[in-house]
Structures are given as structure tokens and as C-alpha cells.
Amino acid sequence: MLTVNDIRQKFLGYFKNYNHQEIPSSSLIPRDDPSLLFTNAGMVQFKKVFTGQETRNYLRATTAQKCLRVGGKHNDLENVGRTARHHTFFEMLGNFSFGDYFKKEAIQFAWAFITEELNLSKEFLYITIYKDDDDAYDIWVNTIGVEPSRIYRMGEKDNFWSMGDTGPCGPCSEIHFDQGETFCCGDNCGIGSCDCDRFLEIWNLVFMQYEQLPSGERVILPKPSIDTGMGLERIVAICQQKSSNYDTDLFQPIIQYMASIAGVHYKKHEETDIALRVIADHSRAIAFMIADGILPSNEGRGYVLRRLIRRAFRFGKQIGMNQPFLYKTVNKVVELMGDIYTELYSRSEFMSRVVFDEEERFSITLDKGLILLEAELNALKEKNTKELPGDIAFKLYDTYGFPLDIINDIASKKHFAVDEANFQHLMQEQKERARSQWKGSGEKRIEACFQTLLEDGMQSEFIGYENLSGTGRIVALLDIDGLPIEELPTKSSGYVITDMTPFYGTSGGQTGDIGILSTITGKTQVVDTLKPATNLIVHVVTVTSGTILLDQEALLVVSESERLDTARNHTCTHILQSVLQKILGDHVRQAGSLVSPTRLRFDFTHIAPLTEEEIHAIELQVNTIIMANLPLRVEFMDQQSALEKGAMALFEEKYGNIVRVVTIGSENQTASIELCGGTHLTSTGQAGCFIIVSETGIAAGVRRIEAITGRNTLAYIKEYQKELSTTAAILKTKPEKVVEKVTSILSENKNLQKTVDTLESSSLSNQGKHLLDNLTRINNIDVLTANLKNFSLKALRDIMDDIRSKLSSGIVCLASTEGTKVHLLLYVSKDLHHNFTASELIKKIVVPIHGAGGGRPDQAQAGGTNPSGLSETFELLKNILEDQ
């Protein structure tokens, strides 16, 4: 029997034999494609090739692509685990032609692979084509020899593919496998008439032969292309003669492992089976998402990951798993697939810790949320209502972190619907509140005016890699509100665009340059430089003298010292990332950065706070590279070549086909290689020195290092020396003896504190004895009330403990005031609990002090904000006892 690895390798090897370039799977995070949350098909990494925006050094390609479909129109989440073939994560096998071969070859390749390489019987194969695609029909019948009765013509919905409203599109042809009558859904079962599993689509061949214009007209492409996709999970199930994808060697090891740790059996109870299948599916998705740099969060891709972890955890709870377990099943995925996808192995330890932490956090809120949901559903049941209100669903989402699909799952099992319309309304209101509070709302208005300039063909040429000064013509002037103007008068601020500039605009985490822009009629201070688009650089200026006019020639001079400081920090950011990966592990990925003249800030994926030893080692290694005075070199090359060379790139960052590669070190000693458009030093020695000033956590699994370089380190060290000298003077010692002196003082202080505690304990004991002299008797009950001013709550408790040890029966109410705060303790001995309990009594007497409290039957505590009400509180207690 063919294993999954056999089939994957057979597919790739088959097409390599026909001159296809094997291309590694791209990340689940689509590069340069803001329209997609995740890579959901094999063609995604080739989209720009198909649209003609990019060229590659090959015309044929084959891939096994990691894909994820959770959300949007490709949302399989609700069906996962309930059907034989729905998954969140899956692998798409594909072969592609970029203007090389077309329909005939694509069909021949597919048919030969299925019937000869996989040995699937032709009698079980059926074909669908687009209704007007006579070419495909002719190839299937006359070249391949498929009987016409096995070919079905389908409409545009089923057999015509398009990339969007415009762009490449074309008919497609699907190969279906007949799984037999046992899968039949009834009398109307058949291709195109039902959605059951009998006639299972296994391979889709897309013939990109048209371009759809904005008018809706379709014109023939000069170089038609091929895009095919075959789901690995489906073809494995067929080859292994399994009725469900979950019964194959892709899923069974995970399912059986999960069943063993949960103490349950697969294929005994349907609900248990669903839970096991969901956990197996989600474990695969979770592992690959984290391996590709996605971390749990409350938005975007991170929120999808969080949903999957929480959903799988809840299904685990249904089969008796009350402790974290997903981190174990995720490791099983690594064990199964790490040899093929090595990124799983390199991040396995990090992955386990992220998942474990997320499970622990969710388990804390899950029980509370489930109790609330259960109570709400029971209340609705009593009212004979079958819909959970949207505000309750939103509270579960907002307060307890319950995704809507989890709420729907639980509600539907109890035959309740959820008012999703009101839920979405409340969600939208929350988003609008967030938008209205966002401080950058003015920025959007400015961006709109820059967009207008771009649409008018406005461009700026950046000459700042080689030059810190230059001349350019002023091609646009905007006032501070972004409105176009003819002149910018003295003392005013605005935006200046020149046709060429040495000023670097904010991008890639690097802040914009500052400097001087002047003309024959005026002078400005450039306080910032923006880069709203690839070819547009905008100078933010304040006119210091004269007037700046549109269409003038301007002299632009970048502040050399500020640029150099920024370059120091940027180069050290590259060195830092490389060092972090060497010391902490390959799981370290950049999660954000800021490079300015004064400091660098680097966010990276790592689960635990750095130890002092790790921080010291990182600092030492970065400074070692600085002192080695390694050269920096900049090269331009195509993106694919750069990545193959080992250059690090941010998946969220937008890169062109030709990229700028910054390499630190020589051929024999490379410290770092990254895609980067920023400004850098020419050698590492120019950085001078590197000091980490802080290391903090900013999100689950994300740490932040802030550091300084160059002359900023000198200022930092000088300030430290000054503080150390001042501290030494106060302590009357030498700077090098400060630690020794402070240690001695702390030790002395500790001994003194012990003496104070002993004296205070004795004093409090005496205080207790003294208070017992003031006992009064009400209705045969010994009662003590006392206001002890300026005692801490701890001291009050110690006095109460002393009194309790000496009073066998009675009621004691002690109070203390600290400013406007009131502390209240109430004790009721056990023999009086048939009439009074401390927890009930305290609630009746705290109103005068504007307080609230509670506790146990024997002792309760309250806090208040009205010290003047204490006498009334004591009087209230006495009245209650007298009335009993």
C-alpha cells in the first residue's frame, strides 16, 4: 500500500521527469497578497507570474503546497470532523505551466499519473468540463480515449475559474473518482446533482486562456497557462482504499495517540470520533501556523490560530481532557511530518510552549464561560425561547474569549439558535468605538491626498543610498491638512514632494530622515520624511524663513549625524536578529521593529523572558561582531535567488521581483543576510558599541528588546556613572563598593525588621488584652467594638487573632482608618452561629461606612470610604443584637 509520503514523492518526481521545477511550499502567510488571510491554493505563490507582473527562470513548476481554509468563502471549519473530507489544513499537489504547454499536455499528464503511476482503474474515473469547452472534450475523447458517457458538461459556477472580477481566467476540467454505491445519497445521486462523496473530485485542471476586462469582456491571452490542484488527503484515501481521509496514515497516528491519552476508543461512539477527528485536524493546522510564524492574538491570523486552539481544547474537554493536551498532539504532527517540512522540527519546542500556555490561559476562562452559557440556556428553556440573545453571545466572546463558532456548537447541541445578527451588530459597534478613539484618524485623510498624487502620476526618485545631499524640483506642495497649495509661507508647516531626494522615507521599520530643504526664496526644517507608496517620498517641513514655491529648484541636505545614528541601529538590528537565532534557536522570527537615530526596538517570537545570562551572551556576541569590523555589501537580485541564498525576509513585508540584499560579513564569515531597503553602515565597526537597555514581553510568545548603539551608548554609560557616583556619595562609600554597601545595609535592615516585628507582636498582644477589658454584654452575648486608628489591615488581623485565642464566646467588631479608607473585621464565635454569622452580619452594618464585604460564618471583612460612619456601624451592630 502506498503511504502518504510515497504518493507525495511520486507526484513531484513524476513532474520533475517532465522538466518541471520542484518549488518548495510557500508559507501559509501569503507574500505580497493583502487579499488573502492564508495561502489557500497551490497557485497563490505564482499569482504574479500568471498575471504577468513577475517572471521566473522556469516555465514549468510542481509543488506540494501547505494550505489553510478557515474563514471567508473557503470556510470548512463547521464541517471538520463531521465529514470524511473537510479539513482546515491540507496539502495541495499541483503542476503549473507559465505560457509553455496547455490543455492537451495538462490532460495527458494528469491521466497518465492517475492511471499508470497510481494504478487507479479507468472504470471508476469520470470527467467534467466547461459546457462550451469543445477543445477539452475533444482531447478527453479522441486523445485520451475516455467514453463520451463519462464526460459531463457543467456550467460556469462549477467549471469556470477566475482570479477575481478582472484578470486571468478560464474553463477547468475535473477528474472524479466513483467510490461506489455505498456512498450514494439517493435516487438523484450523480455528478452535478448532489454533493455526496460517491463521485469524489480528486483533480482540477484549470486552463487559463482568457483575460477578463473591467467591461466584462473576455479576450484570449497571448500565452495561456495551466494551474492544477489535487488534494493530497483525498488521493491518499482513495489509494489506501479508505472511506474517510481520517482513516489514512495522515491522520490515524494522531487520532490513535489522542485516543490513548484520553482513555477512549476510536469508532465506538460518534461524538467521541468527531472530537478525535477535530483534534487531529486542528493539531496539524496549529503546528504549521506556528511554524510559519503565526502566534495567538486577538486579530487577523493570530485570532484564527487562537480559535483553533480553543476549539480543539473544548473538544478535548468533551472526551474528558481537563488539562492541556494539544501541545502533545502538535508534537505528534512534528514527528509525522517534520522530515518533509523541516520548519516543524526547527520550531517544535517553541511550538509546544506556545500551545501549552494558550491552553492553560483558556482553561481558566472556559469553565466560567461554560457556567454562564449553561445558566443562560437553562433560563431560556424555562421561558420556552429557542434563541440565545446576541448580547449574551457577545459577552461570552468579549469577556471569556469564546469564538462565535464555539458558542454556536454548544447552543446547537442543546437545540438553540444564536442571534448572530445582533452579535455582529455589537461587534461592529465595538469596532467603530475603537476607530473613533484611534489617534491616527487624521493620517487617513492625508493618505487620501497622497493617493490622488499617485493617480496623477507623481513620483520621487530616491538617491539617498549614495548621497546625503542633492537638488530636486518641487513637484507638489500641500498644507498641513493635505490640501494642494502654490506656496508655503514662513512659520507654516506642510508637505513638500520633489522629483528626486536623498531623504529616506519611513518604511521597513526605519524612521524617516530629517534635515534642511531650501530654495532661493526660503528655507525649511525637514522634521520627518514619509513614504506613502513605493515611488513617492514626502518631506514634512516647517518653513523657518522666507517662502517655498511650487516648481522651484530645491537643495536637499540630510542630517549626516542623524542618518549615521539610524544606520548604526539598523545594522545592529540585523546583527541582533542573527545572534538571537544562534543563541535562542531557529524559532526566533522578527515580529516587528523600529529603527530610529536614538534607539532600536526589536520584537521577536520567543516564549519565555530572557535570563540575565542570555542577555549578556546576546550583548557580547553582537559586540564581538561589531569589533570584528566586518564589511557590509549590498546587492540587487531577483527575490527567488535571494531567498535561495538564505536571505531572511518578512512574510508581511512587500517586496518587488528585484530585491535589495544586505549581507554583513565576507563570503567565509557571514553574520547576517537579509532583504532590506534601509540605510546601513559600510562596516560593523562603525556601530561602536551595543547595549540592551530593556527586555520585555508584549504579547503571548512575543518578546521585545530595546537597545542603543554608537554615541547613544556613551551618553547612557555617562548617565550610569553619574548615578553610581551620586549613590556612592549618599552611601559614603566608593563607586566600586556600592553593591557591597547596599548588601550590608539590607542585611542590617532585615535584622532590624525582625526586632520591630517582635516588638510589634508584643504590642499587639498587649493591645488585644487591653481591648478585652472593654467587653460589654448584650442579650447574654459578650460584645466588643473598637476603632483602632492608623492600624494596617495586617495589624488589625493580628489583633483579631489574639482576641479570638482568648475569647471562647462572643462577637468582636474591629475597625481601623487610614485616611479615607476604612477596614472592618467581624468575628462571631461558633456557638452563636445558630443566630448570627459574620458573613451575614457584616452586610447589614457596612452601609454607614459606604462599604461592602463578606466572608466565612466565623470571620468576615469589609472595606469602606466613610470613616465618619463608624460609630453608626457599631451602633447598628448593637441594635441588631439587642433586637434578637
From Swiss-Prot:
Source organism superkingdom: Bacteria
Cofactor detail note: Binds 1 zinc ion per subunit.
Entry binding sites for Zn(2+): H570, H574, C676, H680
Single GO molecular function: aminoacyl-tRNA deacylase activity
Gene Ontology cellular component terms for the protein in this record: cytosol
Cofactors (names): Zn(2+)
Keyword Zinc attached: yes
Enzyme Commission number, as recorded: 6.1.1.7
Keyword line: Aminoacyl-tRNA synthetase, ATP-binding, Cytoplasm, Ligase, Metal-binding, Nucleotide-binding, Protein biosynthesis, RNA-binding, tRNA-binding, Zinc
Chief localization: cytoplasm
Organism: Lawsonia intracellularis (strain PHE/MN1-00)
Broad enzyme group: ligase
Pfam families in alphabetical order: DHHA1, tRNA-synt_2c, tRNA_SAD
PANTHER family (UniProt xref): ALANINE--TRNA LIGASE, CYTOPLASMIC (PTHR11777:SF9), ALANYL-TRNA SYNTHETASE (PTHR11777)
CDD domains assigned to the protein according to its UniProt record, in alphabetical order: AlaRS_core
Domain notes per entry: Consists of three domains; the N-terminal catalytic domain, the editing domain and the C-terminal C-Ala domain. The editing domain removes incorrectly charged amino acids, while the C-Ala domain, along with tRNA(Ala), serves as a bridge to cooperatively bring together the editing and aminoacylation centers thus stimulating deacylation of misacylated tRNAs.
Subcellular location: Cytoplasm
UniProt protein name: Alanine--tRNA ligase
Purpose of the protein: Catalyzes the attachment of alanine to tRNA(Ala) in a two-step reaction: alanine is first activated by ATP to form Ala-AMP and then transferred to the acceptor end of tRNA(Ala). Also edits incorrectly charged Ser-tRNA(Ala) and Gly-tRNA(Ala) via its editing domain.
Reactions that this protein is recorded to catalyse: tRNA(Ala) + L-alanine + ATP = L-alanyl-tRNA(Ala) + AMP + diphosphate
